[in-house]
Amino acid sequence: MAFMKKYLLPILGIFLAYYYYSANEEFRPEMLRGKRVIVTGASKGIGREMAYHLARMGAHVVVTARSEESLKKVVSRCLELGAASAHYVAGTMENMTFAEQFVAKAGELVGGLDMLILNHIHYTPLGVFSNDIHLLRRTLEVNLLSYVVLSTAALPMLKQTNGSIVVVSSIAGKIACPLVAAYSASKFALDGFFSSLRMEYEATKVNVSITLCILGLIDTDTAMKAVAGIFNAKASPKEECALEIIKGGTLRQDEVYYDSSILTPLLLRNPGRKIMEFFFLKKYNMERFINN
């Protein structure tokens, strides 16, 4: 009986919560009304669609990407759709100073922050890895390091609002995929960093959620051009994908899976990992790090 109380019941609780709790939460668009949200990589594709969804929900939206002309159009459309306010800051996430300063600027523009959606990537064409260390370094800097810089800069504001960090990742960050070695490495690294960070937040009483979004092939122009004639799979609609990302972040889910195949979440969700993390965390004395 003691063994059951100490081990089996917590395991069962984790398993049930992992599979059912988040799915049973009800999302309502009004949850985003008046919320202050940053979306990176928002000049096109999934990022642009997220900005439009947030605008329809009445959020304050701050978007960033490299193309100022594209961002101007996104902001104009957001205002037409009903955004409480919409702003843009153009720049490249290859520049870590810009990444840090962008968060501060965004906070000034909308008076704080409730949600940070990290969506930008460094484009890497499909191909066999040919020892291009420069490409690998640049991919890791944009796809990983800038995410760390942005989330670190945003944390003080997110702590004030019990906010959320939403990290857009990929199936290529959960399973091995050919022709995308550098990209895949950056996405696996996102899982490792932000999943560990989530555990630290929970253990040290930081009420900021982290949602990792694992996406399959999405029908963005960039993705469709990249995989043409190489990868044979059904692409999912970017509009619906964008909405699912927003829902998952708003409901503070640990992970969101979005793919054309219903098997993807069934096969990739890993209750064994959650159980291991639960018991591993108990081996640490985290009290000394609370409020530090």
UniProtKB/Swiss-Prot annotation:
Membrane-spanning ranges: 7-24
Any single GO CC term annotated in Swiss-Prot or TrEMBL for this entry: intracellular membrane-bounded organelle
Reactions this protein catalyses: an 11beta-hydroxysteroid + NADP(+) = an 11-oxosteroid + NADPH + H(+); corticosterone + NADP(+) = 11-dehydrocorticosterone + NADPH + H(+); cortisone + NADPH + H(+) = cortisol + NADP(+); a 7beta-hydroxysteroid + NADP(+) = a 7-oxosteroid + NADPH + H(+)
Membrane topology: Single-pass type II membrane protein
InterPro entries to which the protein is assigned, alphabetical: 11-beta-HSD (IPR051253), NAD(P)-bd_dom_sf (IPR036291), Sc_DH/Rdtase_CS (IPR020904), SDR_fam (IPR002347)
GO biological process, one term: steroid catabolic process
EC number(s) from the headed UniProt entry: 1.1.1.146, 1.1.1.201
GO molecular function: 11-beta-hydroxysteroid dehydrogenase (NADP+) activity; steroid binding
Signal sequence coordinates: none
Keyword Transmembrane helix found: yes
Protein localization: Endoplasmic reticulum membrane
Pfam family, one: adh_short
Keywords, comma-separated and alphabetical: Endoplasmic reticulum, Membrane, Oxidoreductase, Transmembrane, Transmembrane helix
Gene3D superfamilies: NAD(P)-binding Rossmann-like Domain (3.40.50.720)
Tissue-by-tissue expression: Expressed highest in liver and ovaries (corpora lutea, granulosa cells, thecal, uterine caruncle and intercarunculer tissues), lower expression in kidney and spleen, and lowest in the adrenal.
Assigned protein family: Belongs to the short-chain dehydrogenases/reductases (SDR) family.
Subunit structure, as described in the record: Homodimer.
General function of this protein: Controls the reversible conversion of biologically active glucocorticoids such as cortisone to cortisol, and 11-dehydrocorticosterone to corticosterone in the presence of NADP(H). Participates in the corticosteroid receptor-mediated anti-inflammatory response, as well as metabolic and homeostatic processes. Plays a role in the secretion of aqueous humor in the eye, maintaining a normotensive, intraocular environment. Bidirectional in vitro, predominantly functions as a reductase in vivo, thereby increasing the concentration of active glucocorticoids.
Protein name, per record: 11-beta-hydroxysteroid dehydrogenase 1
Species of provenance: Bos taurus (Bovine)
